[in-house]
Amino acid sequence: MKKVRVTVSDFMFEILKGDSEYFKIPLGKIGNTLFKYFIDKNLSKIELEESSGKKVQFNLSKENEDIFFDVLREKKADTEAELMRDIFFTYINNLRFKREEIIFNNTFKQIREAIKNNIKIGIKYHSTARIINPYFIEVSSKENRAYLFCYCEKNEDFRNYRISDIENIWNLQKEIYIKNKEYIEAIKKNFDPFLSYGNFIKVKMTEEGKVLYERVTQNRPKLVKEEGIYIHLNVVRN
């Protein structure tokens, strides 16, 4: 089993480490996924002193090990470390939602293909198998990550599922069931991860509560009007 060792800048390392934690994927798996993804794509070049920065090392998968040196020659990289550093550099020069799409490229492809062909898919999500009718993929601007909006037959309701949390996916040769087309369009136009569109609650806040509300930057309920304070009700559903 071949081990890859590469020095990256502190900035690059923090992004790679952050994505590993955010998407709950080991850094080695990210390295193998990126190597395979960028085989047929142009790479951005970066020069870095080998003595500076942080070390990243991981074992290549058997599939990647078999083609590693062919790719090294194809990319005209002088060293193994240079090749992987250029791959990492090309990867981090994307916003997080795009990096998510790179890491989970196969999942995105299968979902989009199912939507295009109007067919149902099966997914394993939070350790539970579900049959779903996929409608669209949307990026949450507050979280900078992608969700699949669908109708879940297990729950008999509409759901948003984080694409990065889909553990397995398979196609079903059954036509999508379009349930409540107007609602689907309304959600697409007023998207939020918690499907809070049309749900409102009235909250009376203390001054300390208002300060805490203003500090929240992610998934903060939208302020509708203030007489006290009115906010959208966000309900997390699995």
PLM regions: where:
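Surface-exposed, charged, gly/pro-rich loop-and-adjacent secondary-structure segments at domain edges
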Residues: 150-238
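Short aromatic-glycine-enriched beta-strand elements
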Residues: 144-149
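Short Lys/Arg-rich basic patches
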Residues: 1-11, 40-64
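A short, Trp-centered hydrophobic/proline-enriched beta-strand micro-motif
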Residues: 113-125
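Amphipathic alpha-helical
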Residues: 91-109
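Surface-exposed, Lys/Arg-rich phosphate-binding patches that contact polyanionic backbones
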Residues: 9-29, 62-82, 86
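Short beta-strand-centered aromatic/proline hotspots
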Residues: 130-136
